[in-house]
Every structure is written in C-alpha cells, then in structure tokens.
C-alpha cells in the first residue's frame, strides 16, 4: 500500500456471486430486491423455471436454489413472527392499555424464535455473506418489532440488527456508496 493512497476496507470482498446465465442472474436480482414477507407467485415460478432449465451455469443454478430456499424459509418464519406480534398486540392492546408481564409460554416462544434466528444466521458460510445480510435484514425487522413491544428480554436480543449492518464489509452504507 502506498502512502497517501486510498484503501477500501472490503476491496477484496465480492458482494454477490458470479452468475453467468442472464436468466438466472435476473431471477437472482429479483429475489435480492424483493420483500420476502410474501413472495410473489411470478417470482416463485420464474425461480423454478430458472432452476430446472438446461444450462451450463450449474453454479448459478445452485446459488439461485439456495436463495430460493432461504426466501421460502424466511417467508414461513416471518409468518410465525407476525403471528407472535399479533398475539402480543391482542394480549396487551394496540396502545398498551392492558400491559402485564408476559406469560411463560410467550417468553418461551420468543426465546425459541430468537434462538432459531441466531442458529439460521450461523448456518451461512463465508461465501454466502450476501444471503446472510438479506436474511438478517428481512427477519431482523420482524424481531425488532417484537423486541420493541416487550420489556425484560435478555441481552442476547442485542444481537438482532435492523439493517443487517453487523460488519463494515458489505454494510448498508458501503453498498449505497456514501
């Protein structure tokens, strides 16, 4: 490194994998741009078509298959988190007029949801940082919604991030080029 030269913290980190097939790349980009709360049917059918098509880009198909599986898992998990939030809202009221300590059953459900979230994030390999960030962003938002409505949660809830900016490499600010 030269004196006075700029050095970017993640200049050697690839944010997205290399996909050669244009159709697979387009579906991959659509998935990464979509909200995974409720996947559109058109996106699901495009993914199935791209994954099953005959192409030389087997690596691209494998990457898209991983993203598709993650999106489906996030969609299902988001449904569970929204159900928990709605149950909590029904219990304490939308404005908190019936505030009371959480039931043991609800505390256990929150702990299981948090533990599964942390375990799922830990399952991504070093070459899947892009996917981990997307999952972290999608599920982190829902967990934060639960966290804001509850008091007395353990310090482990501090691990939940909103924007998935748990590191400088690939952070929201860096990707925006600010």
Regions found by a protein language model. Give the residues of each.
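N-terminal organelle-targeting presequences
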Residues: 1-125, 129-132, 154-178
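Charged, alpha-helix-enriched surfaces in structured cytosolic catalytic cores
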Residues: 134, 138-141, 162
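Membrane-proximal amphipathic alpha-helices
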Residues: 137-138, 145, 151, 158
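Positively charged, low-complexity, intrinsically disordered RNA-binding extensions
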Residues: 142-144, 172
